[in-house]
Amino acid sequence: MAIKIKVEFLGGLDIISNSVREHKCVIPFEEGEATVADLITYITKNIISDPKDIPVFIEDGTVRPGILVLINDTDWELEGMEEYVIESGDVFTFTSTLHGG
């Protein structure tokens, strides 16, 4: 069995995934086993198209500062951050809040 979720990259962050904003993913975990930490690993291995772009998304093993993370439209800090247990149907939105100028 696997978990079906949606991952979105907004605010220019889609550049790390060949300019694809929305990804429907089937992650190879049983319901109740996978956490956001597992999802971050999945994203770095399966969605980020160029390994050189991983530092754009990850810093010190987690999502880098300046990226807003929402789980089902709720700030991930309210949901337990990396420890949140993923459920089928969840939507994860990663939005860059940093802009050049």
UniProtKB/Swiss-Prot annotation:
Q: Which keywords are on file for this protein?
A: Cytoplasm, Isopeptide bond, tRNA processing, Ubl conjugation pathway
Q: Which domain of life is it from?
A: Eukaryota
Q: Name one GO biological process term.
A: invasive growth in response to glucose limitation
Describe which pathway this protein belongs to, using the record's wording. tRNA modification; 5-methoxycarbonylmethyl-2-thiouridine-tRNA biosynthesis
- Enumerate the GO terms in the molecular function aspect: protein homodimerization activity; protein tag activity; sulfur carrier activity
Q: Which Gene Ontology cellular component annotation is one that this UniProt entry carries?
A: cytosol
Gene3D superfamilies hit by this protein: 3.10.20.30
Similarity-based family: Belongs to the URM1 family.
Physiological role: Acts as a sulfur carrier required for 2-thiolation of mcm(5)S(2)U at tRNA wobble positions of cytosolic tRNA(Lys), tRNA(Glu) and tRNA(Gln). Serves as sulfur donor in tRNA 2-thiolation reaction by being thiocarboxylated (-COSH) at its C-terminus by the MOCS3 homolog UBA4. The sulfur is then transferred to tRNA to form 2-thiolation of mcm(5)S(2)U. Prior mcm(5) tRNA modification by the elongator complex is required for 2-thiolation. Also acts as a ubiquitin-like protein (UBL) that is covalently conjugated via an isopeptide bond to lysine residues of target proteins such as AHP1.
Protein's name in the database? Ubiquitin-related modifier 1
Organism (species): Candida albicans (strain SC5314 / ATCC MYA-2876)
The record's gene field reads: URM1
